[in-house]
Design a protein with these regions (language model features):
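N-terminal capping segments
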Residues: 1-38, 84-85, 90-91
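Aromatic- and glycine-rich peptidoglycan recognition patches
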Residues: 34, 39-42, 46, 54-70, ...
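Residues that form generic nucleotide/phosphate-binding pockets
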Residues: 51
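Structural motif
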Residues: 76-77
């Protein structure tokens, strides 16, 4: 789904053309009938992750080199960054949407080296093992 975004802003996250990590994901899915349990306001990333677990909407193996190299992750899948002591579900503090793959070249054996393209356009590296949902 196309969501026009201009600026990152947590206070203005639900206004048109503004977003933070969870409202970007929610706005994209909301237009297609998925609202992560909240019809009118984007939940925080941890609550989105909890919804994915409760509704059995997880990708086996999560964010892993095997899932990337074997192209098991789909555009629209969402990665939840965990590990903070923030009192939220599984310590989730960030969510990113996958939009596709990046091709880095070939290794010495001729196998493609792939990475993930994120909806924010940033080429970030996230630690492997993060939870991935497929709403």
């Amino acid at each position: 789904s196309n969501v026009t975004i201009d600026k990152t802003s947590q206070p203005k996250r639900m206004q048109e053309k503004f977003y933070d990590c969870s409202s970007l994901v929610w706005k994209s899915y909301h237009k297609n009938g998925v609202n992560f349990g909240m019809a009118y306001y984007a939940p925080v990333a941890a609550d989105m992750g909890k919804w994915c677990v409760q509704h059995k909407k997880l990708v086996s193996g999560g964010l892993s080199q095997a899932n990337i190299q074997n192209m098991k992750l789909n555009p629209g899948d969402v990665m939840f960054e965990t590990g903070q002591k923030n009192g939220r579900y599984k310590g989730i503090y960030h969510v990113e949407m996958i939009t596709g793959y990046l091709f880095y070249g070939f290794d010495g054996n001729g196998k493609a080296e792939l990475g993930i393209q994120w909806a924010t356009g940033d080429e970030k590296y996230y630690p492997m093992g993060q939870m991935v949902g497929r709403p």
